Amino acid sequence: DKPHLYSAAIESLSENISDSITGPLFYYLLFDLYGAIVYRVVNTYDALFGYRTKRYEWFGKFCARFDDLLNIIPSRLTALVIILFNPKRGLEYITRYGGIKINSTYPMSAFSGVLGVGFEKIGYYKFHGKLPDKDDVFRALKLYKKVVIILLSVVILLCMVV
């Protein structure tokens, strides 16, 4: 159904800010280009091998846990930037839903709160509120752009200072 499809699209968009923007930039600032590359390799390996299959059981677990470890700070930084656009509701949703999964639900709950919509992955989690519609997807894209601009601006400023 469309509301769950829209929910999944916005959830993916919010989580990928951390995975594709904040994480690499964070590790670039700490360890230069090598940090960003290692982060992206680990994140990609988690996506490829992090699921439980007999063939990749141990390697997949290692990738998934290492990715969890590397994302502890970037996921929370991402959520903090997102809630700049509606601090009260964003913080309320992070407090309520942020800890459901170790990292991904922080930016997801921040997006959910700022946009004032609920998310649901049937059988896994449900964030309070009406499920998103098509207009909410466009609002999410606008929020995404604003968050990315802030993240890039901060990194550029830090690079100029250091």
Language model regions located:
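Glycine-rich phosphate/dinucleotide-binding loop and adjoining beta-alpha-beta core of small-molecule
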Residues: 47
